Structures are given as C-alpha cells and as structure tokens.
Amino acid sequence: MKSAWMEKTYTIDGCAFHTQHRKGSSGVTIVFEAGYGTSSETWKPLMADIDDEFGIFTYDRAGIGKSGQSRAKRTADQQVKELESLLKAADVKPPYLAVSHSYGAVITGLWACKNKHDIIGMVLLDPALGDCASFTFIPEEMHKSHTRKMMLEGTHAEFSKSLQELKKRQVHLGNMPLLVLSSGERTEKFAAEQEWQNLHSSILSLSNQSGWIQAKNSSHNIHHDEPHIVHLAIYDVWCAACQQAAPLYQAVN
C-alpha cells in the first residue's frame, strides 16, 4: 500500500514554509534540496518513481514557491537551521538520505557537517560545491539562472557568504556514501568545462566512500533530463549505506 502524502505549512521564526512528506517502509527519508531560486516542484517527476521503501521530504525555501518571505538573512547557515526546524516540526526523524541540486548542495553540505551521524548518504547533482568561492568560471546556463533568480532568494553577498560558511566549516564525512553527478551537455569551451569537472572531482575527497557519475546527455538539470541516472544513484548510495562495502559508480554511459 502506498503511503499517503502529507502537505502542510509550518511557521518558523514568523515565516510560513510549505512542505510535502510521505513515510517509507525502511525508515529512511530522502530529503530533497532544490537549486537556487527553485521550488520543490522541480522534484515531482523524479519523486513519482521512487520506491515506497523510502520516505520523502520536500519543501520550498523562504521566498520560493508556496512559502512566505523571511526577514532573516538568506545564508546557508540560516537555511540549514530552517531545514532542521521543519524536520522537527514535521516529526521526520533520521536517518536521512540527502539529494540536492546546484546551490542546494551548499545547504546539504553544511547540514551534513553539522549532523553527519543523522545522514546516511548524499547524492549531489551538478553541485555548486568545492572551492566555488574562487571559481573563475560559471557555466552560462547557471549564470543566467542565478541572475534571474537572485531577486527571489537573497543577494549576491548572501550567496557568497554561504559559500564561505561551508568552506570554513567543512569537515571530512568519514565513510558516508557520496555520489557526485556532473552534467555532460555543455556548449562552453573545453577548458572551462574541465574547470567545472575539476571542481566536482575535488568534492570526492570529502568522503572515504565517494564516486562520480557523468550524465553525458544532461544539462544542468540532470534530474529533468536523465532521471533514471538519479534513481540509480539514490539506490546505490542507499545500498552502500546499508552494506558499507558496495561499490559506487565511476561513470554512466
């Protein structure tokens, strides 16, 4: 029997947050964190095919989708506090499996640094992680999206502060299974693409059990273009977390 979806609004520090949650038979809940200025609607096509053994928790960050505006600074540290408060309000207990896209990986990364014993694994989709603060190239597709959505979710200064917060507080994640998925469909020059890939490669050192997947037919929105790869990644991380010995993918396609 399929678990019922619960759609609720919780008020945290005066801001109303829209959430959706279902329970799973395994006790593990996948927590989805969307990219910059993007609502939780972005995950709907992917969630439709996730097995019922997994619980699912999604939400709209402040100022996005069906959530209200917040007077608090829109930094990753503040957003992690809000996520933790929402999980507590919704009575969604660990263990968690984190799946995040782009800037969402900054929030997930900081969350994992604070609560690595509650998170059994992470899947990062084209993450804005690593030494991103000193990154000289941002893919054109991401730059346009970032500029367009900036007014929805904070300022450039807050975005930069979030990257610095993570860099300052980054810790090694031990044996936490970690998969990084990089998009492969780029129009930029090779050197710039190589810099982006190197950024993602550097993230692998955060865990003793990490792997990399190149989604060769995907744009920045891998979960839209090749959702089957994301499904495989989630299941692979889950298996690795259960066994702490399962091999992780090195490449796809």
UniProtKB/Swiss-Prot annotation:
Annotated organism of origin: Bacillus subtilis (strain 168)
Domain of life: Bacteria
A Pfam family that the UniProt record links to this protein: Abhydrolase_1
Stated name of the protein: Uncharacterized protein YqjL
